[in-house]
């Protein structure tokens, strides 16, 4: 079977910015994918092609990427006669058609839209669920599927929210839950208590949510945010049963070799900027005082020494996740492994640009006993393919925002459906989230 039609258009993401949607048609029907977009992006990410015309969409249009699908990728892919079930062959074809290391010719957003739509078509051609098709092409174990711990971003700061809080994400992780559905229920209950506490302490407007559905009160310090979350966990009746994870996104406030925790203030006091060692001391204090099990991007992607110095101090206690550091790219994952900088990969398909490359990035991380956390982007859509990716790749952990905003819930609801479909053929990763490959 082959692809008979490929068509792209622009639609809007959860921020109201244009993004690329791709339809791939085969004899089995039409298969659609929508590409997400990030706000805090790594400098080494694959090239997202934007129009740059400031008179429209503030320069964020994607008509060039859409045209690249319709005028270049579509005719070449249809003419190739490639089978939609062969994901690696099609992704390789797309990479050759682009011909650049970072996909700047056609745009990673154009290429990824086609790659993901093809994956859906491939699953339909095999008459299997998408997660099973992904498990097949990644050669993941299928005796029992692993359902992930939902890392839920319940309090937003950094570039995802107003207020002066520097750290970008404060997540809850119900690792002690007996199942995914129970983990989601626990997370939802904690979230509602957090909203109530936030409003009562900071005023009604503090219950307004950030880009990823978490509350975004005007909090200044991470301790204040963590105290609020711990109080919410206790109020919900889950003291000692729900863990906490951070995405610091520290590259966002890395300036002149130091870290400015007051980076949203244009007149921040330079004498208060922290060195890598001072920031590490802050993390160690937080780890000692709160139930933190994972920290993402604790240092800038340019500050490799800080990562390598921090790793031996805390790696036995928690997961250290590379996002901006590794950008789902084997080159940077290998470097992080060699430098002993991290022990987990944040997997974002749009950082690298094809499903096949994403799978290979995960496999490289697994080969060094790293954990892998599948992730959404802050500019999301109703597409829920990452739910199938996290189950198919058996990574055991996903972050896709708070239990709020339908573009976030789309992914979590899809995992609920998969859980129900699999029944006893699936296990919840729980406390084994970091080593889910071994479950």
Curated annotation (Swiss-Prot):
Annotated positions binding Mg(2+): 247, 296, 323
Pfam family name, one: Enolase_N
Sites where the protein binds substrate: 160, 169, 296, 323, 375-378, 399
Keywords: Cytoplasm, Glycolysis, Lyase, Magnesium, Metal-binding
Pathway(s) annotated for this protein in UniProt: Carbohydrate degradation; glycolysis; pyruvate from D-glyceraldehyde 3-phosphate: step 4/5
Compartmental location: Cytoplasm
Keyword Magnesium attached: yes
Cofactor: Mg(2+)
Cofactor mode of binding and number, as noted: Mg(2+) is required for catalysis and for stabilizing the dimer.
Database matches in InterPro entries: Enolase (IPR000941), Enolase-like_C_sf (IPR036849), Enolase-like_N (IPR029017), Enolase_C (IPR020810), Enolase_CS (IPR020809), Enolase_N (IPR020811)
Principal location listed in the UniProt entry: cytoplasm
Molecular functions (GO terms): magnesium ion binding; phosphopyruvate hydratase activity
Entry's EC annotation: 4.2.1.11
Quaternary structure annotation from Swiss-Prot or TrEMBL: Homodimer.
HAMAP family linked to this entry: Enolase (MF_00318)
Record family assignment: Belongs to the enolase family.
Protein name: Enolase 1
Gene that specifies this protein: ENO1
């Amino acid at each position: 079977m082959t692809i008979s039609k490929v068509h792209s258009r622009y639609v809007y993401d959860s921020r109201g910015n244009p993004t690329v949607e791709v339809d791939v048609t085969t004899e089995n029907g039409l298969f659609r994918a929508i590409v997400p977009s990030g706000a805090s992006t790594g400098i080494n990410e694959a090239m997202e092609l934007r129009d740059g015309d400031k008179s429209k969409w503030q320069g964020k249009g994607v008509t060039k990427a859409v045209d690249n699908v319709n005028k270049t990728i579509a005719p070449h892919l249809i003419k190739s006669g490639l089978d939609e079930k062969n994901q690696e062959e099609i992704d390789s074809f797309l990479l050759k058609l682009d011909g650049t290391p970072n996909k700047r010719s056609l745009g990673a957003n154009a290429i990824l839209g086609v790659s993901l739509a093809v994956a859906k078509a491939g699953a339909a051609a095999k008459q299997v669920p998408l997660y099973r098709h992904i498990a097949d092409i990644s050669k993941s174990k299928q005796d029992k599927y692993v359902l992930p711990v939902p890392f839920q971003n319940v309090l937003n700061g950094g570039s995802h929210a107003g207020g002066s809080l520097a750290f970008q994400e404060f997540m809850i992780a119900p690792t002690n839950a007996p199942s995914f559905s129970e983990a989601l229920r626990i997370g939802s209950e904690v979230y509602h208590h957090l909203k109530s506490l936030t409003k009562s302490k900071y005023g009604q407007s503090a219950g307004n949510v950030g880009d990823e559905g978490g509350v975004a009160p005007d909090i200044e310090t991470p301790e204040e945010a963590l105290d609020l979350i711990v109080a919410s966990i206790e109020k919900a009746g889950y003291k000692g049963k729900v863990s906490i994870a951070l995405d610091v996104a520290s590259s966002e406030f890395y300036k002149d070799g130091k870290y400015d925790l007051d980076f949203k203030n244009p007149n921040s006091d330079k004498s208060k900027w922290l060195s890598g060692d001072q920031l590490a001391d802050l993390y160690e204090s937080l780890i000692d005082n709160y139930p933190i099990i994972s920290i993402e991007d604790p240092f800038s992607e340019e500050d490799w020494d800080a990562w390598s110095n921090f790793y031996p101090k805390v790696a036995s206690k928690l997961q250290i996740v590379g996002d901006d550091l590794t950008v789902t790219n084997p080159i940077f994952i290998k470097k992080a492994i060699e430098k002993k900088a991290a022990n987990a990969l944040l997997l974002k398909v749009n950082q690298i640009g094809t499903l096949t490359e994403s799978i290979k990035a995960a496999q490289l991380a697994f080969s060094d006993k790293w954990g892998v956390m599948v992730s959404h982007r802050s500019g999301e859509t109703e597409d829920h393919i990452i739910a199938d990716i996290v189950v198919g790749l058996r990574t055991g952990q996903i972050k896709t925002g708070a239990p709020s905003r339908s573009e976030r819930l789309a992914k979590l609801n899809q995992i609920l459906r998969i859980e129900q479909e699999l029944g006893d053929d699936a296990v919840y990763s729980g406390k084994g989230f970091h080593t889910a490959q071994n479950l």
